[in-house]
Amino acid sequence: MRRMMAAFVALALLASPAVHAVQPDEIMSDPAKETRARDLSRELRCMVCQNQSIDDSDAPLARDLRLLVRERIAAGDSNSQVLDFLVARYGEFVLLKPRFERQTLLLWLLGPLLLTGGGLALWLQIRRRSRSGADLPAPPLTPDEEARLAALMSDEAKSS
């Protein structure tokens, strides 16, 4: 059983996209430049996979983009120059984390605004319920209701 579990784990690791994404022929000889390339690749969206970075994607376009990033780094471009080049070529969508600019202001502010609005609506609803008396205790039972309840409870106790 342990061998089977170990084989399953090994197979799962080998089949994961992150293991196969960066091919050996893509790796740069300079470790510092390779680290920069990997960091930049994690910030860029695979245009085929949509919500996966090009560092994790096996798509042919992701491979081309990884190679392009490495070419730009080898040519001496800074990280911001590489990102600017790719944004100019593919648009802002290529960035997994869009920049905070006038065009993306709504994207950045919509989440906090919705969260604040939802919290305010919840607070108002709770406040309205407490004012309307919804939290008041129920009125006491009448003698007829108490007798009926006692009869139902004794029937329940007999049947169990």
From Swiss-Prot:
Annotated S-S bridges: none
Record keywords: Cytochrome c-type biogenesis, Heme, Iron, Membrane, Metal-binding, Signal, Transmembrane, Transmembrane helix
Compartment annotation: Membrane
Amino acids binding heme: 46, 49
Any one annotated GO CC term: membrane
One Pfam family named in its UniProt record: CcmH
Residues annotated as signal peptide: 1-21
CDD domains: CcmH_N
GO molecular function: metal ion binding
InterPro entries in the cross-refs: CcmH/CycL/Ccl2/NrfF_N (IPR005616), CcmH/CycL/NrfF/Ccl2_sf (IPR038297)
GO biological process per UniProt: cytochrome complex assembly
Bilayer-spanning residue ranges: 104-124
Membrane topology: Single-pass membrane protein
Family from the record: Belongs to the CcmH/CycL/Ccl2/NrfF family.
Function (record text): Required for the biogenesis of c-type cytochromes. Possible subunit of a heme lyase.
Record's protein name: Cytochrome c-type biogenesis protein CcmH
Taxonomic classification: Bacteria, Pseudomonadati, Pseudomonadota, Alphaproteobacteria, Hyphomicrobiales
Recorded name of the encoding gene: ccmH
